[in-house]
């Protein structure tokens, strides 16, 4: 179920504070965060945000098409290694 339109999108306060400070200084630094649930807002466009996937931080460059999506959508947590293959040689 979608979030109510009466409510504002969730963005972690520490992340929003860092974005605003970088926008004021007009700097582009990598911002490290564990907040996968934060929604991408227009103030984040052009910044690189390193999102934690459970093992490492994956750098994500935010574009205008990513607005209103969550940061966690762009940092996959599972690594698919393929299905187990049938090992017919070892059965003989």
Curated annotation (Swiss-Prot):
<dbReference type="GO" id="GO:0003735">
    <property type="term" value="F:structural constituent of ribosome"/>
</dbReference>
<keyword id="KW-0934">Plastid</keyword>
<dbReference type="GO" id="GO:0000028">
    <property type="term" value="P:ribosomal small subunit assembly"/>
</dbReference>
<keyword id="KW-0150">Chloroplast</keyword>
<keyword id="KW-0694">RNA-binding</keyword>
<dbReference type="InterPro" id="IPR005732">
    <property type="entry name" value="Ribosomal_uS19_bac-type"/>
</dbReference>
<keyword id="KW-0689">Ribosomal protein</keyword>
<keyword id="KW-0699">rRNA-binding</keyword>
<dbReference type="GO" id="GO:0006412">
    <property type="term" value="P:translation"/>
</dbReference>
<comment type="function">
    <text>Protein S19 forms a complex with S13 that binds strongly to the 16S ribosomal RNA.</text>
</comment>
<protein>
    <recommendedName>
        <fullName>Small ribosomal subunit protein uS19c</fullName>
    </recommendedName>
</protein>
<keyword id="KW-0687">Ribonucleoprotein</keyword>
<dbReference type="GO" id="GO:0019843">
    <property type="term" value="F:rRNA binding"/>
</dbReference>
<dbReference type="GO" id="GO:0005763">
    <property type="term" value="C:mitochondrial small ribosomal subunit"/>
</dbReference>
<dbReference type="InterPro" id="IPR002222">
    <property type="entry name" value="Ribosomal_uS19"/>
</dbReference>
<dbReference type="GO" id="GO:0009507">
    <property type="term" value="C:chloroplast"/>
</dbReference>
<comment type="similarity">
    <text>Belongs to the universal ribosomal protein uS19 family.</text>
</comment>
<dbReference type="Pfam" id="PF00203">
    <property type="entry name" value="Ribosomal_S19"/>
</dbReference>
<dbReference type="InterPro" id="IPR023575">
    <property type="entry name" value="Ribosomal_uS19_SF"/>
</dbReference>
<dbReference type="InterPro" id="IPR020934">
    <property type="entry name" value="Ribosomal_uS19_CS"/>
</dbReference>
């Amino acid at each position: 179920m979608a979030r109510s339109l009466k409510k504002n999108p969730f963005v972690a306060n520490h992340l929003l504070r860092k974005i605003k400070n970088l926008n004021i200084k007009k700097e582009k630094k990598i911002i490290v965060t564990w907040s996968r649930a934060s929604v991408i807002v227009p103030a984040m466009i052009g910044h690189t945000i390193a999102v934690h996937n459970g093992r490492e931080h994956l750098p994500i460059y935010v574009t205008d098409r990513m607005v209103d999506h969550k940061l966690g959508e762009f940092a996959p947590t599972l690594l698919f290694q393929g299905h187990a293959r049938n090992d017919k040689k070892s059965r003989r």
